[in-house]
């Protein structure tokens, strides 16, 4: 464990769903000096094939954790026991604070598949490169207390608002098309993210506003242009002894909105996965 996980102290405001309402409250996170080191058994099986500028890769992986260190979720603590020792209420019973810490999760099992494809072809006195990279998350098993004891729950494909983890879409795929010519580079990038389930109860008002229990998938396109300025500009009548480039890009080319997530009282988006800022231009 890190020094921060063992001895830190942090306070912020955050939203949680109480017994009958959603409120912003003080959320404190303190260190846990009794943390144990995490241990894991890793298993990998991979194949790589390459020929004449083509490359295909496949990698199955599994990680079996013991005592994985995780930060507690204020919402999960409140859902498990609304009047527990980590919950602070005033004399009227109103929620005013939740205190979280770090803990050792007894068992966690992760598995998935990483895959990739790349190829390079000559095109109009230049070179076209196609790259595809993806991850398929098969399982993310964590323990959950139930009436029948502790059971392992697969968190993949869920928002996981009620667990000590975060949203885990099943598939992520990125593709890149690059055209290179005379030290210039033109790129088109596509970023895909699977949709996932939000099991939080949605009010009738929120339903009327278009919120639902499925967070939509996301497909974002970016473009960029990289130019070698030093190829056209000389400094002190010298050339070839420096490399000067500029890069111009548009992120979220078609100005796609972030998928809506009902996470009362924040009618918002999933900040871990999506960016609500829309189209952006960058110059480097």
Q: What residues fall within each predicted segment?
A:
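Extracellular loop and loop/strand-boundary signature of outer-membrane beta-barrel proteins
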Residues: 30-33, 99-104, 157-164, 206-213, ...
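Short loop/turn motifs that connect adjacent beta-strands in outer-membrane beta-barrel proteins
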Residues: 52-55, 106, 122-130, 143-145, ...
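Flexible, surface-exposed loop regions and adjacent strand-edge segments
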Residues: 7-14, 72-82, 146-155, 202-209, ...
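Gram-negative outer-membrane beta-barrel transporters
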Residues: 61-200
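Outer-membrane beta-barrel signature, preferentially recognizing the C-terminal barrel domain
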Residues: 1-57, 64, 90-113, 118-123, ...
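Residues on the lipid-exposed face of transmembrane beta-strands in outer-membrane beta-barrel proteins
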Residues: 45-49, 115-119, 132, 175-179, ...
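C-terminal beta-signal and adjacent terminal beta-strands/loops
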Residues: 138, 190-203, 227-284
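Extracytoplasmic gating/loop element in the C-terminal half of outer-membrane beta-barrel translocons
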Residues: 186-222
């Amino acid at each position: 464990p890190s020094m921060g996980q063992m001895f830190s102290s942090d306070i912020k405001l955050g939203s949680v769903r109480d017994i009958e309402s959603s409120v912003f409250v003080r959320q404190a996170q303190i260190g846990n000096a009794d943390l144990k080191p995490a241990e894991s058994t890793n298993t990998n099986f991979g194949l790589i094939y390459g020929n004449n500028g083509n490359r295909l890769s496949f990698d199955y992986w599994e990680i079996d954790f013991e005592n994985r260190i995780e930060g507690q979720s204020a919402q999960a603590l409140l859902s498990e026991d609304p009047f527990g020792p980590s919950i602070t209420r005033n004399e009227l019973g109103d929620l005013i604070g939740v205190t979280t810490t770090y803990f050792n999760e007894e068992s966690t099992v992760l598995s998935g598949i990483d895959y990739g494809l790349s190829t390079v072809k000559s095109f109009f006195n230049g070179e076209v490169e196609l790259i595809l990279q993806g991850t398929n998350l098969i399982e993310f098993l964590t323990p959950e207390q139930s009436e029948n004891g502790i059971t392992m729950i697969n968190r993949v494909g869920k928002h996981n608002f009620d667990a000590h983890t975060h949203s885990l879409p099943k598939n992520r795929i990125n593709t890149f098309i690059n055209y290179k010519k005379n030290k210039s580079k033109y790129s088109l990038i596509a970023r895909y993210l699977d949709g996932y389930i939000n099991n939080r109860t949605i009010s009738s008002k929120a339903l009327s506003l278009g919120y639902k229990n499925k967070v939509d998938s996301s497909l974002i396109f970016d473009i960029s242009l990289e130019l070698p300025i030093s190829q056209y500009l000389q400094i002190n009548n010298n050339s070839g002894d420096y490399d000067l480039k500029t890069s111009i890009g548009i992120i979220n080319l078609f100005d796609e909105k972030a998928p809506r997530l009902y996470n009362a009282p924040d009618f918002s988006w999933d900040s871990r996965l999506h960016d609500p800022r829309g189209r952006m231009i960058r110059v480097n």
